[in-house]
Amino acid sequence: MLKIARFLMCCVGAVAAFSPISATGSELKSCGGNTVCPVGDRGYHVMPPDGWDGQTPLPVLIHYHGWGRQGPVPVNHKHIGGATRKLGVLLVAPNGLGKSWSFWRPGSRDTQFTLDVLADVEKRYPINPSQIMVSGYSWGSSMAWRFSCEMGHKVSVLFGISGTLYDQSETCETGPVEIRHVHGLKDTVMDYPYGPNLDETGPIHLWRRTNQCATDPDFQENWSAGQNFRRMHWSDCESGKTITLDIHEGGHWIARGWLAEQLRQLDFTGS
């Protein structure tokens, strides 16, 4: 019995050593996946990548869910959580109040909430502060834009999926280092935001102006990742920041393979 007890104590110690909760935050309630991590009157869901050693600082993707959803949806979504798990990224999925987001005007309550979420994540996981990315789908994408507009100095990459800020004339003090947006031309939920005279670069007008980019993209190309895309890319912006706009012929959905390909290009796995 004594040998068994010693063996069990060793096992418990090994598990504790591998726990993603830091030593200073060991009193925090264990959470992850479908179990919410509480922050104030709501919380968030988190999922580390497969094969993580429990110690190496992780890049973070904050993903805002669509309207009427909550954090477990992106965590369990094959094109969101399925991508981050395989590509070395810690997924953080906040819960919106009333299953929605406050992105319509500057000064969003959800900007501060996101900062509070990040502070809590740092207590539980070692993260790389220079690799904080944001994304979202539909209204969640609009919230990702809002956070990036208000806290761009904290954001390395914005991945927008089928949603923008409605007022593209807004002024953002600073934008993310890199902006990648995807939108369907046949979207009837959050209509494709054409510019004047059906200008297809309309979805990224705010960022093109903020980053002082040329009117026309540097280059265009067709590519595929489960479905076909037409890409426009700006890399000559005076801010030194790049913009990528991917267009597809479909409607309002999370484009198959798109986010995974973006993360793969950034290569957080070291492969």
Region spans (language model):
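Bacterial N-terminal signal peptides
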Residues: 9-17
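A domain-start/cap signature at the N-terminus of enzymes
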Residues: 18-60, 106-109, 135-165, 202-205, ...
